[in-house]
């Protein structure tokens, strides 16, 4: 089934001819925004179905002794979700003319790494959340001990899966991909970002620079790896990979800004996880810091936003997205699209996913 979906996806995605490039990156963004031929919803559904299929085939128990830990791993891995990271990997691969078969193992690994981070983030020692994607979190069902080990096993399985299943790609590219995946998890990746995030809770002297470092590493690093590995597998040049990484870092920050806004504007039912956790834990977030920012550009709206947050999340209106954090997210997405201006119509999926990141409801 997975191979059939891969073949169908490869045939259904046709690279459009590259039109004459506008004079400036901003003009390119405007031109891309005006185009209506690309169906993002259909693209995302196609890639979601492909991702679900390859994920389901990627993990199974090999003996009775491993049944429990594999059950725990599969519970979180197959619990649904947006599957944005695999989509970004596939989109980057296609942008450079690569095959979905070549990038599929890396797409699986990216989602495994993401799932590992969610299992660990939800633990009582960290974010202490009982719900994820509308379901009880892993540790609630299996206990803290099994959840920790399931996350650990998920991480190691991600690397094993890439090494064993990536076919038709030069070995040096696979090694580069493994190195990128390793870096995005480590001290300068999501683990380092999570540590600084935890240690910043309740502190009043955390500034925007620190917050940007946290989320560039905690959130954006894995998105960066998703786009960059997809490009590497397809044979992109170093310069092209660098542009992809810049794009991904910007959408990663935009993703986190949108997440912070949703935490104070959406309900638990809409989010599929406990709403208001950031405020309750006194986490440093973009709404909190931008609400207190004294810059001329944001002064009036920021003060209003800050006062609302400090009073209670229940009083924050649906208009919160029009305040500074929402504008910042849109600015980041515009800048991200500019990074891909040289790729013309081939960048339509990545540009569409950038828009989706700040328009999503959960």
What are these regions (language model features)?
Residues 2-11, 20-362:
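All-alpha prenyltransferase/terpene-synthase fold signal
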